[in-house]
Amino acid sequence: MEHCYKQRFYGIPTHRCLQMTPTLGHCTQSCVFCWRATPETLGIGWEQTQPIKGGDDPDMIVEGAIAAHQKLIYGFGGNPKVTETYLKEALNPIHVAISLEGEPTLYKHLSDLIRSFKSHGFHTVFIVTNGTDPEALRNLGTEPSQLYVSLCAPDENTYESTCRPMINGAWAKVMETLELLKSFNCPTVIRHTLVPKLNMGNINSYAELVKRANPTYIEPKGAMSVGFARKRFAYNEMASYEEILAFGKKLAEETGYKIIDEQYESNIVLLSRLEKPINLYA
């Protein structure tokens, strides 16, 4: 059976994965490749860069996310390709990716949210951040199971044109976050979301930034022209798997990391300083 790269790489049973966000509509960047609806693409505006005042209770968020997840997939019970056992497991998620939309560090109870997911029986909690709030990461009282930082530019000029930050000094904040990664005990990942016409050049500079962060893994991945991203770059402008693999090989040469896995269907390559990835579900 086909499954997400998180299962192939890290042992996560991805039919039991819940994706969610505590910061709907709030982000400090407006990335060209983002599939979400942004104020720009909707032609309306709202304040989306400031931390959410107050914020919902973490337990309420977790319980609401589980209920929404169950409602979303319950109809698969009528699909002859889905077994009763598989559906029953899927209705009981045990992995969460806090990454669906928005910037999670704008939710000021992020540590409590991690703890709440774990207290509700979740085995693994992934967080994906754009790195523009190093202070929030520095103050995390509870670490996730794995921390991702999206680094989608090799230099400040490319960052400005590709990630389109909406706060002052964003590039410097991302650089500060890279320096912070070495202080985390959990596995860390640098994610490069790539589009040939935008941000696939200057691999040497990508390599220098990776060396500063010394992450456990690097994930070069092709951006997808889906959702609202279709308004910003076309399907035929997406990176091919061959281009992503070539990028990964060059990055491996420059960093000393090794390509330890890949998944064609997800258009992604996994590099690491380890010989093999850590199985987070074993």
Residue ranges and their predicted role:
Residues 1-24, 38-61, 65-85, 89-90:
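N-terminal [4Fe-4S]-dependent radical SAM core
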Residues 1, 12, 16-19, 225-229, ...:
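Accessory C-terminal segments flanking Radical SAM cores
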Residues 211, 242-282:
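C-terminal accessory regions of radical SAM enzymes
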Residues 32, 37-46, 224-229:
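Surface-exposed beta-strand-to-loop junctions
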Residues 20, 27, 31-34:
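Short cysteine clusters
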Residues 15, 91-93, 263-267:
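Short Gly/Ser/Thr- and Asp/Glu-enriched loop/turn motifs at secondary-structure junctions
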